[in-house]
Amino acid sequence: MVKLPSASRIRSLATVPSTATRAFATVNPTPPAAQPTKSKPRFEKLDDGLTFDDFLSGDVPPENERVVLGNTKQPRLPSFLKHPIPTGASYSGIKKELRGLGLHTVCEEAKCPNIGECWGGGKGNATATIMLMGDQCTRGCRFCSVKTSRAPPPLDVHEPENTAEAISRWGLGYIVLTSVDRDDLVDGGAAHIASTISKIKQKAPNILVEALTPDFATKGVNVIHTVASSGLDVFAHNVETVERCTPFVRDRRAGFSQSLKVLEEAKKGAKAAGREILTKSSIMLGVGEMEEEIHETLRRLRASDVDVVTFGQYMRPTKRHMKVDRYVEPEEFAKWKNVAEGMGFLYVASGPLVRSSYKAGEFFIENVLKKRRAAAAEHAASQLSTQPPEIAAKV
């Protein structure tokens, strides 16, 4: 039998105020309604900005009150640095031939802005800078877009022959070879570069060869002499920037003094082999250098007996690379050309789009080298003519 509560107990419970909320097992209690909050417009500045009617009326606010979109932390690319997209039969033909032989060019790997101009010329005028030893570099310079690897693939033993074959087909008068750094190789790839130059000279004896080389750091001077005495005409190695900026621009294994030593040893190695070569280096502007530092760099290059120097604008290849400090005006490039020529450099190329292997400079150097060859031949002929007839006949 269930015992019921007494009547007094029921009355006492009825008089106690209840704060409990009634809920059903199958229905969630409804929370108190929240006060609606006004969401902030995503493009508030644009909503408060100009309308189409404002532009029609001409009432445009001052520049400091306008909304600016995009990257404002880097200087805007000037019009004189903009270049057309490369096209044309010559461009397509060179690209197809390079692919067929499995060759790489620094023109493509380094995203050179002059590729359309250099590859777009007719036969005898088109130029391409062949990049030897693959497309993966053991260095990681902050300005360069060439791929980096600690362990690149082995060298292609057929590359020297394929390179010489391609160049002989083009019918060029001047060719530029460059390469990635290969710190993983015992000689840094010097023998591979020298072999390529020798094979080019065998297939096309009259062609002039320029080699833009690595610094061969820790490999010794003999590897520099190997390349310099291989039959090339121009030995190029770039200091890239002033000494103070070198640690921030180039790979930590590269050094300004080491680069000067490479250029000096190249002249010594060629002379020891009975050859006469030109040496060449390049400087990028717009990476944070100061005027006096450029003067000092030029003085040290001349002290190292460098014959040719080029100036060009640093252009950021991707957002992963270091930013441009400033865009140098064409007038300043013209100034540095005059300064360098006054210091005794044989040839100076200076301009926003000039690169170390720029064809305008190649044509000038080609003429200089041909004149030197002609002068040497004339001197030899004059020496021969002064000999007695019987000795001259033996010679």
Curated annotation (Swiss-Prot):
PROSITE patterns: RADICAL_SAM (PS51918). It is found in: Mitochondrion. Its EC number is 2.8.1.8. The keyword Transit peptide applies. GO terms for molecular function: 4 iron, 4 sulfur cluster binding; lipoate synthase activity; metal ion binding. Transmembrane segments: none annotated. Pfam families: LIAS_N, Radical_SAM. This is Lipoyl synthase, mitochondrial. It comes from Cryptococcus neoformans var. neoformans serotype D (strain JEC21 / ATCC MYA-565) (Filobasidiella neoformans).
